[in-house]
Amino acid sequence: MKKLYLIFIMTILGSFLQAQPVTLKSVDAEKEFRLKLYYGNGGKGAFVQYEGKKEIIPLRVKSYRLDTISGGPGQPAKHYFVWDEMVNGKFNGTYKMLQMQNYIADATYIRATDFRHFNLELVEEEGDPDGDDQYLLHGAKISFNHFYNNKLLIEYPDGKKMNAELPFPDSPDAAQQSIIEDYSFDGYDDLAFTIPDAGMGVYSMFTIYLYNPKSKRFGTV
């Protein structure tokens, strides 16, 4: 079974975008607002947190499209995301965004109550990225770091927490990558972490956390 998981990971690694959280700000609102958008491959595990707010708002993938052709040979792939904003389980708005590597374009938010359209733009962060990332998957908030440590924290909706350590890259230039997919083929997305072998680009180490819908917990394979 582990061999099957590894083959599955290797198949999709070539086409997915290693997303990291981005900060967006409004450009045409009467009062500027800012938000941080967290998301994984294909837009999965996404949520937003508005500046000055403690609450996080889940985002449900409405559509995702990968375009590897229109840019031509040697050009970065285009990732088109559309998310539904869900507040207390109810639809509250729509986010749209185009990403090409580190370039963000056509980011918008449409508020459901009055269909107000807000244009958003990327806020350029100063200094090097801290590597911190988070997902919201099956109601659990998952926190980890791509570059600087191997700590994994999963916080469940009932307040329980799980702490773990992930394999850490041998090379200082390597990064911890993550993939959200249904590895157990049971209709529920799971979570995998992969690191390259000594930074050579061959993904030889991986850790998979399968989601159990009965216990509502993640567990390693």
Predicted features, each with a name:
Residues 43-45:
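Extended interaction-bearing regions that mediate binding to partners or small molecules
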Residues 2-3, 159:
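Low-complexity, repetitive regions of proteins mediating host interaction that are extracellular
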Residues 21, 26, 30-41, 54-181, ...:
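Beta-propeller-forming repeat regions
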Residues 13-14, 197:
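Single-residue recognition of alpha-helix boundary sites
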Residues 48-51:
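N-terminal ectodomain recognition module in secreted, GPI-anchored, and membrane glycoproteins
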Residues 3-13:
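Sec-dependent N-terminal signal peptides
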Residues 15-19:
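Sec/Tat signal peptide C-region and signal peptidase I cleavage site
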